[in-house]
Amino acid sequence: VTSVRLVTFNIHHGVGDDRRHDLARIAGVLAAADPDVVCLQEVDRTFGPRSEGVDQAELLARALDRELVWASAIEEPRRDGPAKRYGNALLTRLPVANDAAHRLPGHGEPRAAVRADLVVAGGALTVVATHLSSDSARSRAAQAEALVGLLPPPGRAAVVAGDLNCGASATELTPLRGRLDDGWSRAGARRDQARRWQVWKRDLGLTHPARRPRLRIDLVWVSPEVRVTGAAVLDGSRCSDHHPLQVDLDV
């Protein structure tokens, strides 16, 4: 059995509720959690002024000393420099056996997923990190179906993680529920944000908006081969508009 700590975090291109871009705050939250695998959404790579033109994926991979696997949702070439990229980053300290970037179907803002087969004791753990459509349940349904197509055959350990822009019981996630279980519900122990104004909402896994969370849309789905020993909503309020979700897994 390999114990794996995974964190999924929509980092809002490093801009916090004070409207400041400060990637060091993101790195600090992640370093404190010390995850084996990090699934990041809304990551800029030399995108533009909103994130000071930096390669956020590379900087975070270096800061955390993790291997980077990437999938662009938006990629625009430039004549005078590196391409303008925005999408999903997977950072891992576990060895990567295979990885691939996948475009997802749907209308509106382009969406993507990154898939990595990670080496664990006695086999592999497939992790798919993604960010689904924010404005169309129909698009999310098509994207969920596509995610199922990225999973390994039944009987092999798999995780899907990211900002799915809908709750775990949403109709459009029916394809996922056919193969995977909601990790928060499966967790042996759960810890929510313990702010005083949120006392009546503890144990709900609310992650968005960070200032006063009312939605559980940052989700981790696990196959039956994966045991969820714990789950916690971390505090991302100073560095993003989402809180990170941490899950501890036995694979």
Residue ranges and their predicted role:
Residues 1-37, 62-63, 67-251:
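Active-site regions of metal-assisted phosphoester/phosphodiester hydrolases
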Residues 38-43:
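Acidic beta-strand-to-loop metal/phosphate-binding motif
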Residues 45-55, 80-81:
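Short, flexible/disordered intra-domain loops and linkers
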